[in-house]
């Protein structure tokens, strides 16, 4: 069945699919012929009959598009179609891209449109929605504790040919020097063995990855008791002078909601960090029980909340 589509609807559909290069402008009848000597309907008719033009128009997609927002001078927020959050931090000598997202585009090329500085990569943890494009960098920063997860990324995206030799291992207390801006590393293993957060005291930002908006039902998640102890170490670090009033910036904007759609807006924060420690303690003490959650990885998953904190877990990590 063929459905007739007017030009306005065609342009609207193309823009909804992510094509920012197609525009619709309506002029009074006869205006274009009088002013420019062209008949617009003839132009569109020709375009609709041009197979190459149609292929170009309808191959436009949001999957390879990125949106960027300047959070403050020197820090950009970048988002792909999958609600994956990336951040670009500028120093005097170079810039650091934190995570690569899952989009079909080229996050390195996009980052290079935002800064004139050389761009390096730091990965919060080795999940495909955070490091699909690590192969675009000659070397990158990541905890080598997550290397066993790299084959899972490459099973889904064989073009990712990153090797262990390309990984610059990062540990608790390390710092990545961008020139006048130091990005500090804090290990918060739980979601994965090598999960880290990055602290930028210059711009007052804490990049949390998936350390607080938390799935603990995934393969290789650590015991909840280990995760809690790592959170306590992070709490102690953030209690030191110079670590107050940091903006918590997560790996996905949906982390700012609850476990289920429609729950209240709850951004990552010092309060959520405190509540997550309490939630871990309640789970370990048997004082909190989750409800079945639809996304699992071969073992039943449960979702549980306490104040501003929420977690999806499996019973095998409840120890």
Each model region followed by its residue ranges:
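C-terminal catalytic histidine-bearing segment of alpha/beta-hydrolase fold enzymes
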Residues: 2-63
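Accessory terminal helices/loops
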Residues: 63-65, 232-319
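Conserved beta-strand hairpin/beta-sheet module of binuclear metal-dependent hydrolase folds
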Residues: 66-113, 197-213
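Short acidic-hydrophobic surface loop/beta-edge motif
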Residues: 69-71, 89, 172-178, 293-295
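Active-site neighborhood of phospho(di)ester-bond hydrolases with catalytic His/Asp-centered motifs
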Residues: 97-101, 118-129, 140-144, 187-190, ...
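Active-site HxH/HxHxD metal-binding segment of metal-dependent hydrolases
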Residues: 102-178, 214
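Core dinuclear metal-dependent hydrolase active-site scaffold
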Residues: 173-199
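Active-site-proximal loop/helix segments of hydrolase catalytic cores
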Residues: 189-226, 231-232
């Amino acid at each position: 069945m063929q459905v007739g589509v007017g030009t306005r609807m065609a342009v609207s559909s193309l823009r909804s699919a992510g094509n920012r290069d197609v525009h619709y402008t309506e002029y009074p009848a006869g205006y274009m012929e009088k002013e420019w000597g062209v008949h617009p309907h003839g132009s569109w008719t020709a375009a609709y009959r041009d197979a190459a033009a149609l292929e170009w128009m309808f191959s436009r997609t949001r999957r390879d598009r990125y949106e960027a927002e300047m959070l403050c001078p020197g820090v950009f927020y970048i988002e792909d179609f999958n609600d994956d959050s990336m951040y670009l931090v500028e120093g005097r000598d170079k810039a650091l891209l934190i995570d690569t997202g899952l989009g079909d585009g080229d996050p390195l090329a996009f980052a290079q449109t935002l800064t004139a500085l050389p761009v390096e990569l730091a990965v919060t943890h080795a999940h495909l929605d955070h490091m699909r494009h690590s192969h675009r960098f000659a070397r990158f920063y990541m905890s080598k504790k997550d290397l066993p997860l790299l084959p899972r990324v490459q099973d889904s995206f064989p073009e990712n040919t990153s090797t262990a030799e390309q990984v610059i291992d990062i540990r608790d207390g390390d710092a990545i020097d961008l020139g006048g801006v130091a990005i500090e590393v804090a290990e918060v293993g739980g979601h994965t063995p090598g999960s880290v957060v990055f602290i930028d005291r210059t711009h007052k930002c804490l990049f949390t990855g998936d350390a607080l908006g938390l799935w603990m039902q995934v393969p290789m998640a650590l015991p909840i008791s280990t995760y809690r102890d790592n959170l306590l170490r992070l709490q102690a670090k953030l209690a030191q002078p110079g670590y107050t009033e940091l903006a918590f910036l997560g790996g996905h904007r949906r982390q700012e909601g609850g476990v289920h759609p429609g729950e209240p807006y709850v951004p990552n924060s010092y309060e959520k960090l405190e509540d997550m420690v309490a939630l871990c303690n309640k789970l370990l003490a048997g004082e909190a029980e989750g409800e079945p959650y639809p996304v699992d990885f071969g073992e039943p998953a449960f979702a549980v909340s306490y104040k501003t904190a929420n977690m999806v877990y499996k019973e095998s990590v409840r120890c």
